[in-house]
Swiss-Prot record:
Its main location: cytoplasm. Belongs to the universal ribosomal protein uS14 family. Gene3D superfamilies: 30s Ribosomal Protein S14, Chain N (4.10.830.10). Its cofactor is Zn(2+). GO terms for cellular component: cytosolic ribosome; cytosolic small ribosomal subunit; ribosome; rough endoplasmic reticulum. Keywords: Cytoplasm, Endoplasmic reticulum, Metal-binding, Ribonucleoprotein, Ribosomal protein, Zinc. Pfam families: Ribosomal_S14. GO terms for molecular function: structural constituent of ribosome; zinc ion binding. Binds 1 zinc ion per subunit. It is found in: Cytoplasm, Cytosol; Cytoplasm; Rough endoplasmic reticulum. Disulfide bonds: none annotated. GO terms for biological process: cytoplasmic translation. This is Small ribosomal subunit protein uS14.
Amino acid sequence: MGFATLWYSHPRKYGQGSRCCRACSNRHGLIRKYGLNICRQCFREYANDIGFKKLD
């Protein structure tokens, strides 16, 4: 059994390792509210496209 088969072989059904950004597959800084499942960097990029507006 090689190293490649051992790496990331543990099942991830819950927790931070089981979720990723739908745009870039990043696992850090994930915004899950309202079912967005998008990281904070991608949210800043796509916020207007999604329908969020910046208030003054």
